[in-house]
Amino acid sequence: MEKFTTLEGVAAPLKIVNVDTDMIIPKQYLKTIKRTGLGTGLFSEMRYKEDGSDNPDFVLNQPAYRNAKIIVAGDNFGCGSSREHAPWALLDFGIRCVISTSFADIFYNNCFKNGILPIVVSKDDLDKLFDDADRGANATLTIDLAAQEIRGPDGGTVKFEIDPFRKRCLLEGLDDIGLTLEKGTQIDTYEGEKKTEQPWL
């Protein structure tokens, strides 16, 4: 998993509440178990018209936000059915951070497991970040995970909380496999002891 230390980039304002996982990645894209290639399906029902062409009204199709790395979103982001394809699609598109006042629990947990930082902020702070995001490429945000703060284009900062264990995993790029490999020596020792104690196994 790619480390997350400091992220600087354009933030796309998605001023919609209750964005569910079917909106993030519709069900027709769930046939694959690959983590790559899902970026084209991200928000597809809003990004594309019926004929498959881009919907110019959708924020990620607007020139200022096509390379966005951050999404500033309305309340309760990631609600709905459980599907890890949702963070996969965000990551494949290039999104490494989502900021909102609240997230659905399963989506929130899945983000950390896939190298995406979900940040919870107050309503007042979200409104300020929406104002910054509305300025497009003229105003980038900086996410400093070590300092636990969001720095705006005009020097303002928003502090955020994060579980220390999850923070460490993101900073060091540790997913579940990486965490298991960290215990490699202990696992080898345990296996060796078991072979000695119970050679018939």
Curated annotation (Swiss-Prot):
<dbReference type="InterPro" id="IPR015928">
    <property type="entry name" value="Aconitase/3IPM_dehydase_swvl"/>
</dbReference>
<comment type="function">
    <text>Catalyzes the isomerization between 2-isopropylmalate and 3-isopropylmalate, via the formation of 2-isopropylmaleate.</text>
</comment>
<dbReference type="InterPro" id="IPR050075">
    <property type="entry name" value="LeuD"/>
</dbReference>
<keyword id="KW-0432">Leucine biosynthesis</keyword>
<comment type="similarity">
    <text>Belongs to the LeuD family. LeuD type 1 subfamily.</text>
</comment>
<dbReference type="GO" id="GO:0009316">
    <property type="term" value="C:3-isopropylmalate dehydratase complex"/>
</dbReference>
<dbReference type="GO" id="GO:0003861">
    <property type="term" value="F:3-isopropylmalate dehydratase activity"/>
</dbReference>
<comment type="subunit">
    <text>Heterodimer of LeuC and LeuD.</text>
</comment>
<keyword id="KW-0028">Amino-acid biosynthesis</keyword>
<dbReference type="GO" id="GO:0009098">
    <property type="term" value="P:L-leucine biosynthetic process"/>
</dbReference>
<protein>
    <recommendedName>
        <fullName>3-isopropylmalate dehydratase small subunit</fullName>
        <ecNumber>4.2.1.33</ecNumber>
    </recommendedName>
</protein>
<dbReference type="InterPro" id="IPR033940">
    <property type="entry name" value="IPMI_Swivel"/>
</dbReference>
<dbReference type="InterPro" id="IPR000573">
    <property type="entry name" value="AconitaseA/IPMdHydase_ssu_swvl"/>
</dbReference>
<comment type="pathway">
    <text>Amino-acid biosynthesis; L-leucine biosynthesis; L-leucine from 3-methyl-2-oxobutanoate: step 2/4.</text>
</comment>
<keyword id="KW-0100">Branched-chain amino acid biosynthesis</keyword>
<dbReference type="InterPro" id="IPR004431">
    <property type="entry name" value="3-IsopropMal_deHydase_ssu"/>
</dbReference>
<keyword id="KW-0456">Lyase</keyword>
<dbReference type="Pfam" id="PF00694">
    <property type="entry name" value="Aconitase_C"/>
</dbReference>
